[in-house]
């Protein structure tokens, strides 16, 4: 169920502060965050945000198409190795 429109998008306060500082200083360094639950807002466009996936920080360049999605959607937590082939059927 999506968040109520009257509440607005959720962005962790510490991440919002870092985004505003980076956009004001035109910094190109990635912003590290563990907040996968934060929503991508228009202030983040053009910034690189390193989102933690449980093992490492995955750098993500935020574009206009990402606005309204959560940061965790762009940093997969599971790696699919593929199904094991059945050697008996061959």
UniProtKB/Swiss-Prot annotation:
Molecular-function GO terms, alphabetical: rRNA binding; structural constituent of ribosome
GO (cellular component) term, any one: small ribosomal subunit
Pfam families, A to Z: Ribosomal_S19
Top-rank taxon: Bacteria
Listed PROSITE patterns: RIBOSOMAL_S19
Purpose: Protein S19 forms a complex with S13 that binds strongly to the 16S ribosomal RNA.
Name of this protein: Small ribosomal subunit protein uS19
Native source species: Nitrosococcus oceani (strain ATCC 19707 / BCRC 17464 / JCM 30415 / NCIMB 11848 / C-107)
Gene (name only): rpsS
């Amino acid at each position: 169920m999506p968040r109520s429109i009257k509440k607005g998008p959720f962005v962790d306060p510490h991440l919002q502060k870092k985004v505003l500082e980076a956009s004001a200083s035109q910094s190109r360094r990635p912003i590290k965050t563990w907040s996968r639950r934060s929503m991508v807002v228009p202030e983040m466009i053009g910034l690189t945000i390193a989102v933690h996936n449980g093992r490492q920080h995955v750098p993500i360049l935020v574009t206009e198409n990402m606005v309204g999605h959560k940061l965790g959607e762009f940093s997969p937590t599971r790696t699919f190795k593929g199904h094991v082939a059945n050697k008996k059927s061959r």
